[in-house]
Amino acid sequence: MTPSTPPRSRGTRYLAQPSGNTSSSALMQGQKTPQKPSQNLVPVTPSTTKSFKNAPLLAPPNSNMGMTSPFNGLTSPQRSPFPKSSVKRTLFQFESHDNGTVREEQEPLGRVNRILFPTQQNVDIDAAEEEEEGEVLLPPSRPTSARQLHLSLERDEFDQTHRKKIIKDVPGTPSDKVITFELAKNWNNNSPKNDARSQESEDEEDIIINPVRVGKNPFASDELVTQEIRNERKRAMLRENPDIEDVITYVNKKGEVVEKRRLTDEEKRRFKPKALFQSRDQEH
């Protein structure tokens, strides 16, 4: 883009051209930037149309301010904003939801300003009043209305019901399934014999312990079975099952007999049981 001179402003004011009578010193001073006249400027709205008022709380206390002023300098008022102490106790009576009568008493209010801003005169007066009357300095709590009391009682009942519901919802052992020490003692220590007999017979009963018979381990003992014992065992097995020597039986997984087949002489020789422990007679 080719640079060009910007268009001339319409509101531009030109300086007066120097006349022929102008001195050379005036020409050497140079030209000044033209300024617009002040009457062409847009009027500005003032920040406020009224004069500022003198705020008494923002200004320091004036010596002319007397008792008519609500501020009265930096001293505290000598009267409490609470009701006068001459007003005695007032009874607030209302009926609760259970047709009962509730009464609350409002204690007279003390002068709090003398405690916050004490003076020598006020200290003496307060000491005398405390000795005589013993007034309460702090204001008492406000009386409770019948509606607030009713709502508080309903809230307490709801909280108790909610706690009971939470206790019931918590999982626990049923009462009929709880095992006590007495029940465990009856299960483990009492036998049918003891229940049938009297308490005296239980005390005098002799305990008989039968000896436990332990079978002999043939692999750990040095004793050998004789041939007579072997033949006796063989005859007992043949009496129970005569086909035990030459018949093979097939059973399924349920233990039911599926098939029986007789063995050949070759199979008898192969499947013949062998004695693990031989006697001295067989060895020789």
From Swiss-Prot:
**Keyword Nucleus in annotation:** yes
Which processes are annotated in GO (biological process)? G1/S transition of mitotic cell cycle; negative regulation of macroautophagy
Top-rank lineage group of the source organism: Eukaryota
Q: Where is the signal peptide?
A: none
Q: Where in the cell is it found?
A: Cytoplasm; Nucleus
* Lysine derivative found at: 268, 272, 274
- Determine if Nucleus is one of this entry's keywords: yes
Give the Phosphoserine positions (modified residues).
76, 198, 201
Tell me where it mainly resides: cytoplasm
Alphabetical UniProt keywords: Cytoplasm, Nucleus, Phosphoprotein
**Modified how:** Phosphorylated by cyclin-dependent kinases CDC28 and PHO85 in association with G1-cyclins, promoting degradation of SIC1 and exit form G1. May contain a covalently attached chromophore.
GO MF annotations for this entry? cyclin-dependent protein serine/threonine kinase inhibitor activity; SCF ubiquitin ligase complex binding
Q: What is the effect of changing residue 173 to A?
A: Impairs the ability to arrest the cell cycle
- Cite the record's Polar residues compositional bias ranges: 18-52, 61-79
Task: State any GO CC term.
Answer: nucleus
- Phosphothreonine carried by residues: 5, 33, 173
In residue numbers, the region (Disordered) covers: 1-89
**What other note does the entry give for this protein?**
Present with 768 molecules/cell in log phase SD medium.
Q: How does it assemble?
A: Interacts with HOG1.
What function does this protein fulfil? Substrate and inhibitor of the cyclin-dependent protein kinase CDC28. Its activity could be important for faithful segregation of chromosomes to daughter cells. It acts in response to a signal from a post-start checkpoint.
The identity of this protein, by name, is: Protein SIC1
Q: Which organism is it from?
A: Saccharomyces cerevisiae (strain ATCC 204508 / S288c) (Baker's yeast)
